[in-house]
Amino acid sequence: MAAPAGCQLYLAAPAELPPDFAATLTAVLEAAEIACLRLPPRPGMAHLVRLAQGRGTAVVIEGDPDLAAALGADGVHLPDLKTYGAARDRLGADAIIGVSCDRSRHDAMEAGEAGADYVAFAADLELVRWWAELMLVPVVAELQSPDQAAEFAAAGAEFIALGEALWRDPAGAPAAVRNLAMLLR
């Protein structure tokens, strides 16, 4: 995936989903193309998985491969590499397995060598740039603000991830996603 033109949106749902989250998610998915949605590990979310997948959005579950399998999600987002092997065994070769690496080059290289489908870094521009220049495994830049998106896309991030800042945007999550998608074009 090339950047910045190939940079895609990756959304992390809030840890606590509000009662109207399905309606908000529907509006967000209609506002822009979302490559991936990360959901918190909660049972009873199969309807959200189906909703996102029905719009062509891959869904990963935070940290719980068994729940990901039970919900029919596309994969799992792991907090570190410790359970990567078990997750791959549980979900199979076709599942998406991403690994959070915070700001660690070493952890990211180990995740890439293990076969992770993507690595995720905290908002560290130089680290994202370094990874994108040297490695083939896609990088997700976990940002705190949509204002950082263009800079990280230009640095080579294949995916821009936003969480709470997007869902709590004063203009509303659909407007925030639409603006972010236009920024990344």
Model-predicted segments: where are they?
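Generic structural marker for isolated residues within well-ordered, non-membrane alpha-helices
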Residues: 25, 84, 128
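C-terminal binding/interaction regions
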Residues: 159
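Short beta-strand-loop elements within alpha/beta enzyme cores
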Residues: 118-122
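Charged helix-capping and loop-helix junction motifs
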Residues: 124-128, 176
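Alpha-helical membrane segments in multi-pass integral membrane proteins
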Residues: 128-129, 142
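Short, acidic/turn-prone active-site loops that include or flank metal/cofactor-
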Residues: 16, 80-84, 102-104, 123-125, ...
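Conserved phosphotransfer cores of two-component systems
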Residues: 132-134
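Conserved N-terminal beta1-alpha1 strand-loop-helix module at the mouth
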Residues: 1-77, 90-97, 102-103, 109-117, ...
